[in-house]
Amino acid sequence: CSAVADDTLPQNCRQVKYSLCRIAFDFQNERLGEVVDTLYNARMEGQSVSFPRLSPDGRFLAFTLHDFGNFSIWHKEADLYMLDLLTSRKYPLDVFNSEEAESYHSWSGNGRWMVFSSRRIDGLYTRLFIGYVDSEGVGHKPFLLPQKDPLTYYDALMFSYNIPELMRSAVTVDACRLAGCLRSGKKSNLR
């Protein structure tokens, strides 16, 4: 994502809008390309993009669209959108969206499911919903993340889920070792 530099922040924070851009990457040489392609132009279209996430098959790009900035969970108008990278068609994931904020999202490994954060239940707390996405990029009715006793669990929960990620297995990497690798800035195989 890219936005025009603004020296008048934070006063004009509502004017900051992020465009969605694409640039080639050479994996072998670890270099970015030189041509930047703007997929969503915030200045022309009027809203801001955050959390672009590519489907595992590379066909679809899901993202959050909201009025300004990049912290979409605080924007009631924030909705999930999809971009078909074969046709360049951009469209809202209407069945995933509500009157409240939908924000961070994550694809399943097979690209047929998404988990996303939503405030649809009460407008205050972020809960996780899971929805099916078919091969044409159409979302189907999502459901609240199941719990053993959902009424007790969700009524008593005083925390929000903000950054859901679907995992294939349990995380087995030692947290201290991971932090050390991140701080070093060096490539490492943590298996």
Where would I find each of the regions flagged by the language model?
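Sequence signature of WD/YWTD-type beta-propeller architectures
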Residues: C1-R191
